[in-house]
Amino acid sequence: MQVKIVSFKEEFSKDFYNLNVEWLKSYFYVEPFDEEILSKPQEFIIDKGGFIFFATYNSENVGTVALMPTNSKTTFELTKMAVLPNLRGLNIGQKLLQHCIEFSKNHSFK
């Protein structure tokens, strides 16, 4: 399985929302706060200095993860990780996590 990790593009906003809402509905529930953040990733994550990555397979976004800044400019929280249900267990989440670790090291983040 050839999975590629790519950075956020505005046209991926709906995929970010759908992947995360599916995960939340499966394991928890979607709170109003989640709804707001997930529906506006550019405003609530990217514009605040965060990063969003996607796992793509056959030109489809099949997983996502975000790095959100904390009060420190060099410390980020890994959040909003989700993978399509039918592709879980195939190490896609692990690839997203590894990408975040390498990205953070390359940018001297904690």
Label the model's feature ranges.
Residues 7-79, 84-86, 94-99, 103, ...:
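Acetyl-CoA-dependent GNAT
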Residues 2-4:
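Extreme N-terminal starter segment of soluble prokaryotic enzymes
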Residues 110:
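Short acidic/polar active-site loop segments enriched in Thr and Asp
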Residues 90:
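Flexible nucleotide-binding loop
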